[in-house]
C-alpha cells in the first residue's frame, strides 16, 4: 500500500481502512504468540501501513483547516 493510493481516498474510507488494518495487526500478534505466524515481518508491514493511513488522515484534516 502506497501513500499515493491513500491520499485520494475520503476520510471515511481511510478510517474504515484504519480499523481493518488495526484488526489485522491484532490477529497477527495473536498468531505470533501462538507460534502460528510463519513470517514475523508481516507485523512490521502492518504497522507501517497503519502509519501511512494515519498520515493520510492527518493530511486531510490539515488541508481542510486551511
Curated annotation (Swiss-Prot):
A GO CC term assigned to this protein in UniProt: cytosolic large ribosomal subunit
Transmembrane segments: none
Record keywords, A-Z: Ribonucleoprotein, Ribosomal protein
Disulfide bonds: none
Record flagged with keyword Ribonucleoprotein: yes
Alphabetized InterPro entries for the sequence: Ribosomal_protein_uL29, Ribosomal_uL29, Ribosomal_uL29_CS, Ribosomal_uL29_sf
Name of one Pfam family that matches: Ribosomal_L29
Superkingdom of the source species: Bacteria
GO biological process: translation
Gene Ontology MF: a single term: structural constituent of ribosome
Family that this chain belongs to: Belongs to the universal ribosomal protein uL29 family.
Protein name per Swiss-Prot or TrEMBL: Large ribosomal subunit protein uL29
UniProt lineage: Bacteria, Pseudomonadati, Campylobacterota, Epsilonproteobacteria, Campylobacterales
Gene name tied to this protein: rpmC
Amino acid at each position: 500500500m502506497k501513500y499515493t493510493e491513500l491520499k485520494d481516498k475520503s476520510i471515511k474510507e481511510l478510517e474504515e481502512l484504519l480499523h481493518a488494518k488495526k484488526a489485522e495487526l491484532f490477529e497477527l500478534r495473536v498468531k505470533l504468540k501462538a507460534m502460528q505466524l510463519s513470517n514475523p515481518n508481516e507485523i512490521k508491514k502492518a504497522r507501517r501501513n497503519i502509519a501511512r493511513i494515519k498520515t493520510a488522515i492527518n493530511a486531510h484534516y490539515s488541508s481542510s483547516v486551511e
